[in-house]
Amino acid sequence: MAFENVDLFDAVANASLEKYGWQDRCEAKLIVLSENATYMVKNKETGEKEGVLRISRPGYHTLDELNSEMKWLRQINDYTPLLVANPIKGLDGKNIQEITGPDGNVYFCVICDFLPGEAPDENNEEQMVKQFRYLGETTAYLHRQTEIWNGTDKLDRMVWTYDTIIGEHAAWGDWRAFPEMTSDAENILSEVSRIIKRRLE
């Protein structure tokens, strides 16, 4: 499957809106295509942002892994001061919708609340420092929450190792297959990859 097939993901996005009964009043516009296809869901008349749709790449996450993620989000929402984008239930009462795409693959779709915000400005060092400090505080809350929640051991999540991150069987695919990869960049990154692997062994 060509993950860059935007038309395919657009079709899945439109089909997912029907699972929420939103197909008449909302439209989904692609934000980014990476390990997931992420869409902004807006009201057609008012332009109001009603949610963010995430379409998982087939084979990237299992349904159990995504359900675990939904449970953890609920715990974070209920037991920490952190503001999280909660999943919105479909007409069937489920957080995760399964859509069969035009290619015959099943796609897992989740719409979460829209939370306003902005990406870090890499040209504003002072702002970046503040945002990374806040990111550190947020990460600390998440670590603490996993320590005190007795449901953590029941979560089915991807295991992050050298092999699943940048190895030959990486979850996001082989980084060497990046269309704009140059031979110089590949040589440098290959050396970095070998150093990382050696240090982790």
Where are these regions (language model features)?
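Juxta-kinase regulatory segment immediately upstream of eukaryotic protein kinase catalytic domains
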Residues: M1-E27
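An alpha-helical support segment within catalytic cores of ATP-dependent transferases
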Residues: F9-K19, I148-G151, I166-E201
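Short secondary-structure junctions
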Residues: L17-R25, Y79-L83, E201
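Short beta-strand
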Residues: A28-V32, N86-K89, D153
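Active-site acidic catalytic loop and adjacent metal/ATP-binding pocket
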Residues: S34-V52, P87, S190, R194-E201
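ATP-binding pocket architecture of kinase catalytic cores
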Residues: N43-N150
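A cross-family kinase active-site recognition segment
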Residues: E122-D184
